[in-house]
């Protein structure tokens, strides 16, 4: 390091006591000479070491100076200042206890950390004719020696062409640039290789054998550069997308046996079955041979239409089939007749509607006193008479299931006259 003037043995004033002084000095903001220079000794600084920001060519009639962390000259970034008259050192909010100010405006930073890297601003106050001050502002950027980087990966075992991977160069280093290398060559930019805004993260969209690596990253700043060890992705073979074959897509409820098969067959895979997005639970009604590739349902209900999926897995992951949904045939259930009124007066309107749960929809027909009236769900008589009294039956039939059902009600029509 260069020759230093010993720091004065003076009183040390907290930064709050400088509020008025700082405002006055900033008010005298006139241009000055640009011959002042700042250099770091040593030029390559490692974390945990000391560095001196050595100032050259200080002007005559120096009144004082202020050091700031960064390029913002405010109290928040204020480290320390020195006032020549009285040899007073003042510390600000950005003072960490590791900075030492010297009378020649140099600043010693001990036990340097990564947070210390970055720009520093020296604000010099110079006396002129004794009635006003002249100030100058000089900025210097401190660069630490770059650490040896390492590469972290979101997935070291991606599926070929199927999975995206992000590679990140660690650690995050201020005021440094990042470079990437693949197969020892500068990284080519293609549609499948993208860099983040800072170049610190590399995105690989669909890894192939040509983009599996090895990869290296480099951290570089004006004083040093360091490159990581190579990282190569373990490219896994692409899993074939499975599909389901089934013996009957239109089973009858509680009657037909269903056989699901997950294709393709391979001894290298394990098979998993899914129903409605949930792993199919173990149940006495569900039969699965040892290999689990075949799923047997001795019967199925209307609540088990699916969707069904099968998944093939290896030690690194799996892939699911497209969903398969059953068209379960059921019903007709016992029909319902609305409204349930049974008493009418002559001349009123009779309107009855019949419904029954059924898939496919059931066929409907009505009989009155065992005489066929008409097909359809609804029965309408505009002017009912006593002749319409009797037993009304709604019959339903599902031709797909071969099942029938019916519901009856008694209607009583009374004669009445206006008194």
From Swiss-Prot:
Disulfide bond sites: 169-217, 262-310, 354-394
InterPro entries (UniProt xref): CEA_cell_adhesion, Ig-like_dom, Ig-like_dom_sf, Ig-like_fold, Ig_sub, Ig_sub2, Ig_V-set
GO terms (BP aspect): female pregnancy
Coiled coil: none
Keyword hit for Signal: yes
Entry GO terms, CC: extracellular region
Family statement: Belongs to the immunoglobulin superfamily. CEA family.
Protein name, as recorded: Pregnancy-specific beta-1-glycoprotein 1
UniProt source species: Homo sapiens
Gene: PSG1
């Amino acid at each position: 390091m260069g020759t230093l003037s010993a720091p004065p043995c003076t009183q040390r004033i907290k930064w709050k006591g400088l509020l008025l002084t700082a405002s006055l000095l900033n008010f005298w903001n006139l241009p000055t000479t640009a011959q002042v220079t700042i250099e770091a000794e040593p030029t390559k600084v490692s974390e945990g070491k000391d560095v001196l920001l050595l100032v050259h060519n200080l002007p005559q009639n120096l009144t004082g100076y202020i050091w700031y962390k960064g390029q913002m000259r405010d109290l928040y970034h204020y480290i320390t200042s020195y006032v020549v008259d009285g040899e007073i050192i003042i510390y600000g909010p950005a003072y960490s206890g590791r900075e030492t100010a010297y009378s020649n405006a140099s600043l010693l930073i001990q036990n340097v950390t990564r947070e210390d890297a970055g720009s520093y601003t020296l604000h010099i106050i110079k006396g002129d004719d004794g009635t006003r001050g002249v100030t100058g502002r000089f900025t210097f950027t401190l660069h630490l020696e770059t650490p040896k980087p390492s590469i972290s990966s979101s997935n070291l075992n991606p599926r070929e062409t199927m999975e995206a991977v992000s590679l990140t160069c660690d650690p995050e280093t201020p005021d440094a640039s990042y470079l990437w290398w693949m197969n020892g060559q500068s990284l080519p930019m293609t549609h499948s290789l993208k860099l983040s805004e800072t170049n610190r993260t590399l995105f690989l969209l669909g890894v192939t054998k040509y983009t599996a690596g090895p990869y290296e990253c480099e951290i570089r700043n004006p004083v040093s550069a360091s490159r990581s060890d190579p990282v190569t992705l373990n490219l896994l073979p692409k899993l074939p997308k499975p599909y389901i074959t089934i013996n009957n897509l239109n089973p009858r409820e509680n009657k037909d046996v269903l056989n699901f098969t997950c294709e393709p067959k391979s001894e290298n895979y394990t098979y998993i079955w899914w129903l409605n997005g949930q792993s199919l639970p173990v149940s006495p009604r569900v039969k699965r041979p040892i290999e689990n590739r075949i799923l047997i349902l001795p019967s199925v209900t209307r609540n088990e239409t699916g969707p069904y999926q099968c998944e093939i897995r290896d030690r690194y992951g799996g892939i699911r089939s497209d969903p398969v949904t059953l068209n379960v045939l059921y019903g007709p259930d016992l029909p319902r007749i609305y409204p349930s009124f049974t008493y009418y007066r002559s001349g009123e309107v009779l309107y009855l509607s019949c419904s029954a749960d059924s898939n496919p929809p059931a066929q409907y027909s009505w009989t009155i006193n065992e005489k066929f009236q008409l097909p359809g769900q609804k029965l309408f008589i505009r002017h009912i008479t006593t002749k319409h009294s009797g037993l009304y039956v709604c019959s339903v039939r599902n031709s797909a299931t071969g099942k029938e059902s019916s519901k009856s009600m008694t209607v009583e029509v009374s004669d009445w006259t206006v008194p």
